[in-house]
Amino acid sequence: MCYTLCITVRFEWDEEKDVANQRKHGVDFESAARVFADPDYVLREDRTDEGGEMRWHAIGLVEAVLLLVVHVYRSSIDGEEIIRIISARRTRKQERRGYFQ
């Protein structure tokens, strides 16, 4: 038996942080959101921030570039899942190894 599950996910981010991230890492958050479209993306816990939210790392391919996206999960009032992007950059060597294993 096979089920198809369709979930609407909304992405959000701080626009100023997006501009700063582009300057620092050369990755914009709109492109970073595409990591979640990679069927083989890898998800790992990062840490809990000062506000008590659990941060996550998603690693996935976007246009043949392997990116790491730091994000948190939130829910809207109507129950829609929200992924808030905090930062994004190209992966480091050890992070790439974890993706391709």
Where are the regions that the model predicts?
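Ribonuclease/tRNase effector modules and their secretory precursors
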Residues: 1-101
